[in-house]
Amino acid sequence: MAGHSRWHNIKNKKAKADAIKGRMFTKVIKEITIAARLGGGDPEANPRLRIAIEKAKEVNMPMENVERAIKRGTGELEGVNYEEVQYEGYGPGGVAIVVEATTDNRNRTTAEIRHIFSKYGGNLGSSGCVSFSFEDKGIINVPKDKYSEDEIFEKAIEAGAEDVIMDDPEYYEIRTAPSELYKVRENLEKMGVEIAKAELTKIPTTTVQITDEETATKLMKLLDALEDNDDVQKVYANFDIPESILEKLEG
């Protein structure tokens, strides 16, 4: 039965990977459509669209899908009218959570997000209830094996960045004001800096310590369920979990 078991495991992993890929396609198509609607269909003149197209390449999306999404955004093709919605609430342990969604039916999405919060021990709140716990930033990831700390810090500041965070083992995290992200990225590219990723994000101003495995497990289930929703683009939370508990959860 060893062969059968191995096949079964591969099938399950492939099904999961395909599902994740399908969800990523949906999320990226929505982002491309909205970016094109708001800033036009030319990626050279629309930095948000350019980054969305790069994300499409990362998930191996066929270019014809990308082009159709752009045309739907610009109105050249008839398509779904998406709107951006933000939800705020609390998770297990009092963790603040912000959910960014893109939807063609706000009522449906709101009901689904509320259900997910309730099912996994959270509580969907009103607009503004937790957003003060985060600040908007642009982040640019640069591989650590390419540059020394001094070198990347000097280049980042010269490019107009606010700071460089060194915590990640693989990447420097260059932080910018949200409005300066695309400009700083372009300045770095002109300097020949290799960029792994650039995106707008929310960074917690304070964190909630989760020190027991049960609460951590509930929180992870809530965050996973939110991210699995087709309308959800990004999920932010201000938790801090000790390495010892994280290792158990991953195990």
From Swiss-Prot:
The keyword Cytoplasm applies. The keyword Transcription applies. Pfam families: TACO1_YebC_N, Transcrip_reg. Gene3D superfamilies: 1.10.10.200, 3.30.70.980. GO terms for cellular component: cytosol. One of its GO terms (biological process) is regulation of DNA-templated transcription. One of its GO terms (molecular function) is DNA binding. NCBIfam families: PRK00110.1, PRK12378.1, YebC/PmpR family DNA-binding transcriptional regulator. HAMAP family: Transcrip_reg_TACO1. This is Probable transcriptional regulatory protein SYO3AOP1_0685. It comes from Sulfurihydrogenibium sp. (strain YO3AOP1).
